[in-house]
Amino acid sequence: LALILGIALWMGGLLTSGWRSGAEAQGRVDFERDIRPLLLARCSGCHGAERSKGELRLDQRERALRGGASGPVIMPGDSAGSELIRRVTSRESTEQMPPTGERLSERELGLLRNWIDAGANWPAETVSGATANEPRRAEKSTWWSLQPMRAAIPPTPADIPAAWAGSAIDRLVYAGLAAKGLQPSPPADRRTLIRRLFYDLTGLPPTPEEVSAFVADRDPGAWERLVDRLLASPQYGEQWGRHWLDVARFGESKGFEQNHIINNLWGYRDYVIRSFNEDKPYDRFVVEQLAGDVVGAGEPEVEIATGFLVCGPYDSVGNQDEAQQKVIRANTVDDLITATSNAFLGLTVNCARCHHHKFDPIPTEDYYRLRAAFDGVTHAERVVATAEARATHAARLGPLEARRKSVVAEIETLEKAISSRALKLANREGRWSLPRATRQFNEHRFAPVRATHLRFLIRATSDRPRSGENARLDEFEVWTAGEATRNIALAATGATVSGSTTRRAEDVVGGNTYGVELVTDGRFGERWFVGSPAALTLRFPRPEIIDRIVFSQDRTLEPGTEASHLGSFVTEYEIEVSEDGQSWRRVADSQAREPFNEAQKIERFLARVTTADEATRLETLRAGRRELEGEIKSIPPLPLHWAGKFVEPKEPTYVHRGGDPQRRGSEVAPASLAILDGALPGFALSARAPEAERRLALARWIVDERNPLTARVMVNRLWHYHFGTGIVDTPSDFGFLGGRPTHPELLDWLANRLREHGWRLKPLHREILLSQTWQQASDHREEAARVDGSSRLLWRFPPRRLDAEEVRDTMLQVAGRLDLRAGGPGFRLYRYLEDNVATYVPLDHHGPETWRRAVYHQNTRASLIDGLTDFDLPDNASAAPTRARTISPLQSLTQFNHQLTLELASVLVERLEREAGADDEARVKRAFQLAFQRPPTASELAAARRLIEEHGWRALTRALLNANELFFLR
């Protein structure tokens, strides 16, 4: 406890002090971000433009502050005295607001209270998305994002500072500030800038040596050279590729109930990273992800790009019901439509699946025209290899497969002839004294025999005529002979049991649910999963005279009950006994029992009808087959990647009325969206157009230079990741319910520049990073915040918390353990356990195999990723064009006590000893340089030395790895 208090006091007193202004700004309630969306979502239905109950409107500043028929409802500075707060917290049915539906959450109530207590700041004119008093539907003739891009040259404001006059970006941002009476912030200091730049472009901190060199380099071109160096680094593609993977809803498990892992999707991740590093033109990047198999046939590095189409959640459970199968397929294609329209066009086309889009001019027919373009896409793995590799592989494999096919054909012909004779003999001579085996109950009597051991050899199951593996067996009973007969196969009477199992104890959360001990536990319902060898051995505490066994799969089932879902059960077997556990003799077998099916009937009589020549020939052929199969297996297979398979649609595409696949509407063919008909030529294909042509036509239409959405959407994403919020704050929705651009002229200027640069992103990055706008300090200024609380107009650089991956990578780098190996299969921060469903169990130890960058972690859906989920790692059940950046006590508690933190704290101590020697002051200074890229202040140095004296070096390094300054970017 003393250690924890010591570290907490040291961190609270020192490390947060340098961050206070940024942290407070992060926690400030912002009207546009926090309050307007809340009022629109929860209040404007009754108090908006269409309805204003009680003469109260909460969608307009003046009318909201004025109040309604009963007076003001918002008392700035006094939430406790505000009628609005009283109503939303009331439990009286006649007063509570909203009157029906879900109540406001504690978080929403807290936002409202804090906003009112802070003065209920409601900017007179703000840039926002749809409000309740605007038209309820966008018109394609007037909606801003559907209009052609403007190519105007930004004017130079008369009073602009000289440093801001040289860049079009700066001129446009300055004009927006000046219009609100705001001034930009001064430039950040050089240490802040280099740290900001490294995280922006690479997601990693600079080394102390890189910081010192840049701070000392006063050459005017030093900043440009640094920007260019980082844009050329491999880590740039890892950082910006990670952003795109969020947009692409990339996850390496299928989601849904089973959530099985996908082990060969990493090729798409590597393709994305490689594309960013190579500065692949964005239009080419789009086309390859939709039709890489078409435009890059025979080029694996291009073909693999279609992983975009199938990297989303996929319901692989299957269903016997035809109607349900159609629903699952409709949902699967809907994911493709959603991902494509969101990522590349910034449109929510998926909202037109069941009816015309409620807000954007997208008719239902257009949704299904887009569906027709994707109807041939299936979620599956496929070979991705060069034509040369395919030819070489075929040349080696072809002759062997041909020989194997010939051998197999001869074996099948011979076996068929023998089986036919065996079946005739079985039907003629077969006499059975016992009924066929069942799931529910099977008894087998034999002559009384003395035994201390009994062995039950499973020779066949209900679905395997020659193997006992995978059978399920519940209670197994061994009964003594005589009148006072008793079951001695019980753990309670001292019997012990051994046998194979297909599941290990560590493979099952909570223990070995499938263990062999279940056959002697005296309870029904849980079954032993038989493995190999398929045998059960019982040992009794003393010699016994026995004369029968009883076994079943599930004795609770009624006779005749269909229970195929329970798997296979025992049908053929042998019973052996022993008095010493060494010498065994057979006392009974299933030959007396009626065969379970025709295949097992044939199996029993094969030996009697097979001639010596036939047996010899079969053995020779089977040996030849085994040899050929061994040779075939020795040839390395062509690489399989989860990149989708493409098949020609079996039937036309129809509109689903109300989104129901059972309610067919009119037939549609692949075509473009009418929403952009006025801006660029559309495409319309035949309903019988080849599958590949459909996706390629769509891709080329999306990247047509006249398309006003594609370039706008992508440059807005760049702006979003550079500044924390896009010019449009809804990066994947440029429709009516999305945000409006704060700087529309700047958005169009950037989009035009992207096309002028040949759709390459790095030149645009460079222009943004060289701008004075990006290089501003992040210090909070109260007078500016009153006008623009979230700095949407960019009067300062918006500070932010590091993303989850950046947090982990930073800790590893500071400790000196980050492994920068790139590409290939990912690592796991969990143990993967697969039964019918998948389970992901967090690791309790972290070693070199987990020290790679987090972008290479095999992220799965619907699972808590240890150390990352707490910092808002998205689940990717859907796309994550924006990430939450929460700040919570749980993050601090988890981070402070996490096994990785503890391990790296010790590793960092060792690093400091190696790099700074035995001098305590030198080691403290080195620690601060590694963690924060700055030396400690005198007070920090003194406090650190006291902490070390009281609690040791690991206390200091643990504190540094949990400090605000490490996790926040200014």
In which residue ranges do the predicted regions lie?
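Active-site histidine-acidic residue metal-binding/catalytic motifs
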Residues: 25, 97, 144, 256, ...
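Primarily short, surface-exposed interaction patches in extracytoplasmic proteins
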Residues: 161-196, 200-235, 250-297, 361, ...
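Short, solvent-exposed loop/turn and secondary-structure capping segments
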Residues: 48-51, 55-58, 98-100, 109, ...
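Solvent-exposed helix-loop boundary motif
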Residues: 17-113, 121-175, 195-196, 206-211, ...
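Extended surface/linker regions that mediate inter-domain or inter-protein docking
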Residues: 222-364, 370-375, 759
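Aromatic, loop-rich ligand-recognition surfaces of beta-strand-rich domains
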Residues: 428-627, 692-697
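Bacterial N-terminal signal peptides
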Residues: 2-17
